[in-house]
């Protein structure tokens, strides 16, 4: 026998959780695209130096955090859609939600913080060496670093809200 249909507040909460999972994935995908395509060519004294995001360790960490977060978001999106369609939640999903949301949210938050920190430090160092204006390609490189870090921050906010809901669900379950 099928479970009774959920009450309207439970449906709207499930829709909110689904929306937050989708937003998390979207923020992480856009951050990945911006970060992975971030490069600049610096011409100095007749020689050109190609500088990629992967030349900065903190940007690599950001990329790793975004990839791991995206994999988790896709897995959770699958489970959320499955639960939404069937109306039944696997007991294992409570623990996955509880621990996974917390772990991945902190990973994404530290990726964002690393991105903001290294971008500011590198930009300040570069400004001390060379006059930089907003049309300079190097400034665009740093702006993309800030954009990626901002998107990771937005993904963290979504994951933090999801973490609060998963804490309530875990407490309610026990």
UniProtKB/Swiss-Prot annotation:
Keywords: Cell membrane, Membrane, Transmembrane, Transmembrane helix. Signal peptide: none annotated. Homodimer and heterodimers. GO terms for cellular component: plasma membrane. It comes from Arabidopsis thaliana (Mouse-ear cress). InterPro entries: CASP_dom. Pfam families: CASP_dom. Residues 36-60, 119-150 are extracellular. Its main location: membrane. This is CASP-like protein 4D2. The keyword GTP-binding does not apply. Residues 1-14, 82-97, 172-174 are cytoplasmic. It is a multi-pass membrane protein. Belongs to the Casparian strip membrane proteins (CASP) family. The chain crosses the membrane at residues 15-35, 61-81, 98-118, 151-171.
